[in-house]
């Protein structure tokens, strides 16, 4: 049914009234006008589907095509851009690309986990008390201390899916994340205060960083301290969730 609906949407895609473009800064740097128009029509088309499960699969496919049709380049650790004037756009090729993505998503959807799963939104630096000692295995993948911003990399999806409307919202999310310092979050580092929960040698290293001959040395020192203080809270929280003889990966 999912693929059948996807094919039907593509057959009539040019008939849909496009949604408003997302308020991401300088949108035509991300997508040329024809690509942005196609995505806006596709978003409008998906909104007409009533089956929630199909909508979820279409949304996953939409996220993939958002990047495939973009000017984003991945030749650097952080997203950069190709020349916005490069490339020829064909709506027929875009339709074929979307169906191809849907077919890939459909194959993945057939691989269902055997265990029951639950998704909880919470701060990984402080897990709920009811989770203490509850798990025999915990897998965590914290961010690396390289100042890469995950919210910066996820902006295309977050804006197209209406999770973000302003750059301040993105900055606020990044400030809440471990290691996040994108946008306004960078300036917040200037007033951030350490809780002195780490071994003294870490603070000695941070002091050396702050004394470096660089105008951003103080901010970088605070970044290092905030990252490792957040990680200390995260790892302590992870271990609190482990049952006796539990394992953490």
Predicted features and spans:
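Conserved SAM-binding strand-loop segment of SAM-dependent methyltransferases
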Residues: 113-126
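Short, contiguous acidic/charged loop-to-helix segments that flank catalytic cores in large enzymes
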Residues: 218-229
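Conserved binding/catalytic microenvironments
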Residues: 142
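Class I S-adenosyl-L-methionine-dependent methyltransferase module
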Residues: 1-110, 151-218, 239
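Short glycine-centered segments of the SAM/dcSAM-binding site in methyltransferase folds
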Residues: 247-248
